[in-house]
């Protein structure tokens, strides 16, 4: 098949590109900054069988706002797909996305879902939890934080659970929706097979990188304040405000109704030492070079 992938240079989009090209499918790559003009997109989409819309952000930078990247871009992609006669659109969304929750990230992801569901196109909306793997934010920043700080601050005074989802399992499901044309007009939730506390996830990563940090529960408001500082001064923030909201809620239940995932597509990869090691970057501790004003 011929597939357009938006956000193709990002974490999930990049893994999807690798999977599909490895199977011999033709992939057209589009960056999230190239989604502003419907007519130009329609020309690119012409002759394509499907669009995988993976473009997204977890913090706002200048004109790259949640409204523009998640909502306006999705509206443009859906309109261009209709014009070009694309058969299928697969939207990458977030597990807890929902309306009227007070989080611009969650609400904009929900708006994108609604645009796709009401587009008239055959669609699959994939509401994924916390995804990890080579090139991710979770393992990359967690491991670097462990190399930098002897204390790790847990989000909230009462721990919440997560179900880490291997990017390989996510891409497997997206491939089924695109290539095999499964999951027609469905909104599904994808979570890893193992429910653990964030502290346990930190301990497992720490063991792999050879660190033994002290784990300290901190109020959510403290993390939000630190996240705002990170967003302001770091090129790629250690954490963002949206990520703190995500972790403070827990990531084990969808924020809106979904349909069950077929048995053969249910994620199976556990958050094991091998999986963690395969996804870890080569980088060490944070340094001055991570600050915005350093080249």
Regions found by a protein language model. Give the residues of each.
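Oxidoreductase cofactor-interface core, primarily capturing Rossmann-like NAD(P)-dependent enzymes
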Residues: 100-211
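NAD(P)H-binding glycine-rich loop region in Rossmannoid oxidoreductase-like domains
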Residues: 35-84, 94-99
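Conserved glycine-rich Rossmann-like NAD(P)H-binding loop of the short-chain dehydrogenase/reductase
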Residues: 25-32
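Mid/C-terminal beta-alpha module of Rossmann-like enzyme folds, strongest
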Residues: 177-239, 253-295
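A short helix->loop->beta-strand "cap" motif at the edges of active sites that frequently abuts
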Residues: 84-88, 121
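SDR active-site strand-loop-helix element
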Residues: 6, 54-55, 89-95, 126-128
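N-terminal Rossmann NAD(P)H-binding glycine-rich loop of SDR-like oxidoreductase domains
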Residues: 1-23
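Residues forming the Rossmann-fold NAD(P)(H) cofactor-binding site
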Residues: 13-14, 71, 110
């Amino acid at each position: 098949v011929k597939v357009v992938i938006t956000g193709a240079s990002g974490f999930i989009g990049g893994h999807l590109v690798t999977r599909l090209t490895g199977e011999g499918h033709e992939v057209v790559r589009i960056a999230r900054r190239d989604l502003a003009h419907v007519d130009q997109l329609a020309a690119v989409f012409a002759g394509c069988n499907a669009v995988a819309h993976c473009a997204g952000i977890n913090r706002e930078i200048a004109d790259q706002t949640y409204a523009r990247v998640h909502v306006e871009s999705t509206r443009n992609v859906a309109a261009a797909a209709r014009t070009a006669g694309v058969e299928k659109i697969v939207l990458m969304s977030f597990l807890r996305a929902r309306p009227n929750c007070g989080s611009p990230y969650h609400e904009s992801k929900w708006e994108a879902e609604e645009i796709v569901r009401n587009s008239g196109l055959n669609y699959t909306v994939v509401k994924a939890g916390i995804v990890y793997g080579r090139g991710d934010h979770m393992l990359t920043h967690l491991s670097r934080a462990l190399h930098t700080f002897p204390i790790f601050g847990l989000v909230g005074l009462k721990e919440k659970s997560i179900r880490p989802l291997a990017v390989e399992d996510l891409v497997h499901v997206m491939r089924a929706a695109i290539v095999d044309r499964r999951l027609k007009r469905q909104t599904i939730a994808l979570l890893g097979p193992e429910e653990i506390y964030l502290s346990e996830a930190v301990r497992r990563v720490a063991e792999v990188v050879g660190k033994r940090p002290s784990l300290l529960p901190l109020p959510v408001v403290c993390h939000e304040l630190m996240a705002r500082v990170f967003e302001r001064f770091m090129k790629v923030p250690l954490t963002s405000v949206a990520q703190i909201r995500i972790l403070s809620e827990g990531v084990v239940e969808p924020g809106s109704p979904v349909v069950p995932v077929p048995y053969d597509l249910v994620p199976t990869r556990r958050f094991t030492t091998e999986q963690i090691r395969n996804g870890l970057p080569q980088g060490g501790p944070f340094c001055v070079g991570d600050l915005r004003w350093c080249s």
